[in-house]
C-alpha cells in the first residue's frame, strides 16, 4: 500500500511560505504505474485564470512521475501526483528523487520541492537474474587464482539486512573437485583452499541455496570455469587515487572515470559491497553518486574508500584493482545575510570628513561567528574617495562639495560581503548616498558702464549684467533693480538692461543703477537665498537734435559799394538755444549769389567788386541771398537752417557820398513759422482688399451674364418678329395712353419696333388726346395709333 498523506496548504490567496511544502514521502519499490504518491490541497480565491499545478523537474532526471493533476472539490483545489506508465522503482539503483512543483493562483506563484524516498520491499526480495535461471551464472577464473580467494559475490538485494543464510548444496566429491568451494553469509564464493592449479578448462557446477526469514528460500546455480594462465595483462596507470568532491552533487552525478589498460575491459566495485553511495559503469568505468552526499544528514560520508576492479570480458582472471578515496567537502550553501539589506543615506554637502553614514551587520548562516570580509565597490563614476568603509561602518572620507564641475549629488556603491567558505559566497548590499546641496556662496556681479545715445528708442538693449555664483548649479541667479530711475529695466533671468523711456543729454548725462542679484534652486530649502549687488553706470551720448537759429532770420540791407573795394555787408548771429555750449558753425551761400558778388568770411557776409571789371551794373540792383547755417563738430547728424538776406546794391555812380550800409531787419518777433501739413489717408486691412476684389469680380461677372442674356433675347426678337407680338405691343401702348409714362414711352417703342409692316399701316383718322393735348393718327379697324 502507498502511504498517502493529505497536506493542507493555506494560501492568502496562495501559500505564502515555501516551508509549508512536504519535505519527504516514502514509497515502496514494488509500486507500479498509476500509483498515487501524494495528494496536495490548496486554497485559492482566484477563479480567473484557472489555478494550475505544474511539474517543473525531477532530480535525478526520470520519466517515472506523471504531471500532477488539479481538481476542485468542495471549494478546495486538490492536486494528485502519480507514477507514470514507465515507472520501475528500484531502491538499489536510485533510492531518492527530488520533485520540484509549481502552483499558480492568479498572480501569485509558489514553488516547492517534494522528496521521494524509495523503500525496499521485503516481499519483493527473491533470487533473480542469471543466478536463478536454469543455465545459472557462469564465472571464469584463472587457474592461478589464490587459494581461498573470492571468486564471486552473490548479490541478493535486501537480504544483507535480514540475515540470509547461503550454502552450497551440490556435491563436491573428489576427484572431480580439487577441494570444496565455500560461500559465506555475505555471499562471497571462495576458491578451494587447495587452489585451482591444474584445473584448467574444467567446469564446476555449484548449486547454492539461500534461506531468509521464516521458511523463505531460493536456489540458484553458479558455474565456475577454470581458464589457463592469461596471455594478456590488465593494469591501472596508478594504484590509488584521492578524489575531492562537493557535498551538493546530485544523485547520478559523475565523480570520476577510471581507465585501465587491457582489451575489452569491464569494471566493478569490489568493496564495499553493496556500495551505498557510489556506482560504477560496467563498460565505461564512470563512478557516479547514487544518493545525496549531505554531510549534515548522513554520517560517514566525509571519506569513502572504494576498491575498483577492471577485468577482461570473458577472462575474469585478467584483472587489476584500484583504490579510490572519496573526500566529500563541505559546500558553502548560503551567502552572508546582512541588515539592513539596502543602505540609503542623505547628508548635506557640508558634512565633515568622518561622518558616520550607516553601520552594517552581517552573519554567515553556514558558520555562525565566522569572520567576514567587507569591500566597498563604486557603481557610478563619482569620486570614489568621497566614501570609505572601516570594517562595517560607512563614513564620509572626503569633502562632498558639489560646487565643482561634475554632478556629485548621488553616490551609488555596493558593499561586497564575502565569507570564507568554499565556494566563496558573496552578498551585495547596495549603497545610495544622496548629497543635499547647501547654498554657501553669495552671488556677485561686476560693475559695468554702458553708453547710449540720447535718441535711442525704447526697449533698446544697452548691455547685460553678468552675475556669477559658485554654488551648483552655477550662475543660477535672478536680477532685480534696487531703486534708481525707472527709465531703465533689467531682465529678471538674462540680466539684460533695456531702455524704457526717452533720454535727453541736455537734461541728464549720467545714470547710476543698482542691480541686485539673488540666487535660487541651490539649497534643499527653497526659501534660503543669498544676494549681492553691483552698480551699473549709464552714460548718455549727445546727439545733434536741434538746428541752429539765426537772429534775425531775415535781413534787408542797402549798401553803397565803391568800385574795387570790398564792403562788409553784415555779420550773422546764430546759435542753438538748447545747446548754448555749441559755438562752431559753418556758413555757406546756397542761393541768390549771381555772378558770385558776395562771399562769406566765417559769419561775415562781404561784397567784393575786385573781379567785377566792366560788368559793374549801371543801376541799383537787389540780391536775395540764402545763407545755410549748419552746426559743426563731431556730433551727428549735422542740422542746418537757412537765413535770408536781401541786399540792395547801389553802384558807384548812383551816389557820390561815402559808402554806407542801410539795414532793414525783421524784428525778432517775426520768426519763421513751421507749418506741418498732415495728410490723412486710409489704409485698409489686407483681408478687406481681398474681399472687396472678390466681390467686385463676382459683380462684374453677374452684370456681364445679365447683359449677355438681354442681348441674346433682343437678337431673337429682332430676327423673328411675329404678328401676335406686334399686336400685343400695340395693345400695351393703348393700355397706357392715359399715363404720363405711357405717353413718354410710346413713341420710343413705336420707333424701336417699326418694321415695314407696321409703318405701312393706313391711319384713317386724327384726334387729340384729352389729357396731354397731343394729336395722333389712328386706324379705325385695327385701333393702331401714331402720335404726331
Curated annotation (Swiss-Prot):
The residues that the database entry marks as glycosylated are 242
Q: Which SMART domains does its entry note?
A: CA (SM00112)
All copies of domain Cadherin, residue ranges: 237-338, 339-449, 444-554, 551-674
Q: This protein is called what?
A: Cadherin-related family member 4
Q: Where in the cell is it found?
A: Membrane
**One annotated GO biological process:** homophilic cell adhesion via plasma membrane adhesion molecules
Q: Which GO MF terms does the UniProt record name?
A: calcium ion binding
Which residue intervals are topologically Cytoplasmic? 708-788
Q: Which domain of life is it from?
A: Eukaryota
List all membrane-crossing ranges: 687-707
Amino acid at each position: 500500500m502507498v502511504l498517502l498523506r493529505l497536506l493542507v496548504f493555506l494560501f492568502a490567496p496562495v501559500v505564502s511560505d515555501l516551508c509549508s511544502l512536504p519535505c519527504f514521502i516514502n514509497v515502496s519499490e514494488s509500486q507500479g504505474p498509476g500509483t498515487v504518491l501524494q495528494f496536495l490541497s490548496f486554497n485559492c480565491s482566484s477563479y480567473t485564470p484557472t489555478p494550475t499545478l505544474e511539474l517543473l523537474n525531477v532530480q535525478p532526471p526520470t520519466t517515472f512521475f506523471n504531471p500532477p493533476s488539479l481538481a476542485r472539490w468542495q471549494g478546495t483545489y486538490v492536486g494528485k501526483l502519480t507514477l507514470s506508465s514507465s515507472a520501475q522503482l528500484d531502491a538499489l539503483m536510485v533510492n531518492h528523487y527530488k520533485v520540484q512543483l509549481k502552483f499558480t493562483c492568479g498572480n501569485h506563484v509558489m514553488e516547492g520541492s517534494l522528496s521521494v524516498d524509495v523503500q525496499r520491499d521485503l516481499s519483493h526480495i527473491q533470487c533473480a537474474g542469471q543466478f536463478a535461471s536454469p543455465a545459472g551464472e557462469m564465472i571464469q577464473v584463472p587457474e592461478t587464482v589464490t587459494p581461498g580467494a573470492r571468486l564471486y559475490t552473490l548479490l541478493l538485494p535486501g537480504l544483507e539486512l535480514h540475515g540470509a543464510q547461503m550454502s552450497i548444496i551440490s556435491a563436491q566429491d573428489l576427484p572431480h573437485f580439487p577441494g570444496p568451494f565455500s560461500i559465506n553469509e555475505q555471499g562471497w564464493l571462495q576458491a578451494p583452499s587447495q587452489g585451482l592449479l591444474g584445473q584448467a578448462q574444467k567446469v564446476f557446477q555449484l548449486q547454492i541455496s539461500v534461506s531468509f526469514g521464516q521458511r523463505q528460500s531460493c536456489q540458484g546455480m553458479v558455474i565456475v570455469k577454470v581458464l589457463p594462465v592469461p596471455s594478456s595483462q590488465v593494469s591501472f596507470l596508478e594504484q590509488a587515487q584521492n578524489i575531492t568532491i562537493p557535498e551538493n552533487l546530485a544523485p547520478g552525478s559523475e565523480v570520476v572515470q577510471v581507465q585501465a589498460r587491457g582489451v575489452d575491459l569491464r569494471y566493478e566495485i569490489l568493496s564495499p559491497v553493496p556500495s551505498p553511495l557510489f556506482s560504477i559503469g560496467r563498460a565505461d568505468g564512470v563512478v557516479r553518486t547514487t544518493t545525496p552526499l549531505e554531510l549534515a544528514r548522513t554520517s560517514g560520508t566525509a571519506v569513502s574508500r572504494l576498491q575498483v576492479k577492471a577485468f577482461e570480458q570473458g577472462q575474469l582472471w585478467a584483472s587489476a584493482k584500484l583504490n579510490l578515496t572519496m573526500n566529500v567537502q563541505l559546500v558553502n550553501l548560503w551567502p552572508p545575510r546582512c541588515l539592513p539589506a539596502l543602505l540609503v543615506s542623505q547628508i548635506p554637502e557640508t558634512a565633515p570628513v568622518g561622518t558616520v553614514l550607516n553601520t552594517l551587520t552581517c552573519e554567515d548562516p553556514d558558520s555562525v561567528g565566522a569572520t567576514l570580509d567587507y569591500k566597498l565597490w563604486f557603481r557610478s563614476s563619482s569620486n570614489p574617495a568621497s566614501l570609505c568603509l572601516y570594517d562595517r561602518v560607512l563614513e564620509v572620507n572626503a569633502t562632498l562639495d558639489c560646487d565643482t564641475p561634475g554632478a556629485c549629488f548621488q553616490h551609488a556603491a555596493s558593499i561586497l560581503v564575502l565569507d570564507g567558505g568554499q565556494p566563496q559566497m558573496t552578498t551585495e548590499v547596495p549603497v545610495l548616498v544622496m548629497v543635499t546641496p547647501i547654498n554657501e556662496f553669495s552671488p556677485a556681479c561686476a560693475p559695468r558702464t554702458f553708453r547710449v545715445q540720447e535718441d535711442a528708442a525704447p526697449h533698446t538693449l544697452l548691455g547685460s549684467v553678468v552675475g556669477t555664483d559658485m554654488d551648483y548649479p552655477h550662475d543660477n541667479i535672478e536680477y532685480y533693480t534696487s531703486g534708481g530711475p525707472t527709465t531703465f529695466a533689467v531682465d529678471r533671468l538674462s540680466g539684460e538692461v533695456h531702455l524704457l523711456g526717452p533720454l535727453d543729454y541736455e537734461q541728464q548725462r549720467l545714470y547710476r543703477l543698482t542691480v541686485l542679484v539673488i540666487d535660487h534652486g541651490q539649497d534643499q530649502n527653497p526659501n534660503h537665498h543669498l544676494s549681492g549687488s553691483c552698480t551699473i553706470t549709464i552714460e548718455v551720448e549727445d546727439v545733434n537734435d536741434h538746428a541752429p537759429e539765426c537772429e534775425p532770420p531775415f535781413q534787408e540791407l542797402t549798401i553803397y559799394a565803391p568800385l574795387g573795394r570790398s564792403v562788409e555787408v553784415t555779420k550773422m548771429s546764430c546759435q542753438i538755444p538748447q545747446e548754448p555750449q555749441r559755438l562752431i558753425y559753418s556758413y555757406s551761400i546756397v542761393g541768390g549769389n549771381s555772378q558770385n558778388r558776395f562771399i562769406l568770411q566765417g559769419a561775415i557776409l562781404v561784397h567784393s567788386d575786385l573781379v567785377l571789371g566792366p560788368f559793374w551794373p549801371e543801376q541799383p540792383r537787389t540780391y536775395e541771398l540764402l545763407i545755410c547755417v549748419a552746426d559743426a563738430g563731431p556730433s551727428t547728424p549735422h542740422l542746418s537752417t537757412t537765413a535770408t538776406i536781401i541786399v540792395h546794391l547801389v553802384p558807384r555812380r548812383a551816389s557820390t557820398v561815402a559808402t554806407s550800409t542801410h539795414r532793414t531787419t525783421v524784428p525778432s518777433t517775426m520768426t519763421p513759422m513751421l507749418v506741418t501739413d498732415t495728410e490723412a489717408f486710409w489704409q485698409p486691412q489686407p483681408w478687406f482688399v481681398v474681399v472687396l476684389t472678390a466681390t467686385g469680380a463676382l459683380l462684374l461677372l453677374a452684370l456681364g451674364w445679365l447683359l449677355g442674356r438681354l442681348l441674346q433675347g433682343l437678337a431673337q426678337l429682332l430676327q423673328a418678329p411675329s404678328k401676335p407680338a406686334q399686336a400685343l405691343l400695340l395693345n400695351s401702348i393703348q393700355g397706357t395712353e392715359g399715363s404720363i409714362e405711357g405717353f413718354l414711352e410710346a413713341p420710343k417703342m413705336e420707333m424701336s419696333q417699326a418694321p415695314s409692316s407696321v409703318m405701312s399701316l393706313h391711319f384713317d383718322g386724327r384726334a387729340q388726346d384729352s389729357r396731354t393735348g397731343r394729336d395722333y393718327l389712328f386706324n379705325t379697324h385695327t385701333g393702331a395709333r401714331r402720335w404726331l
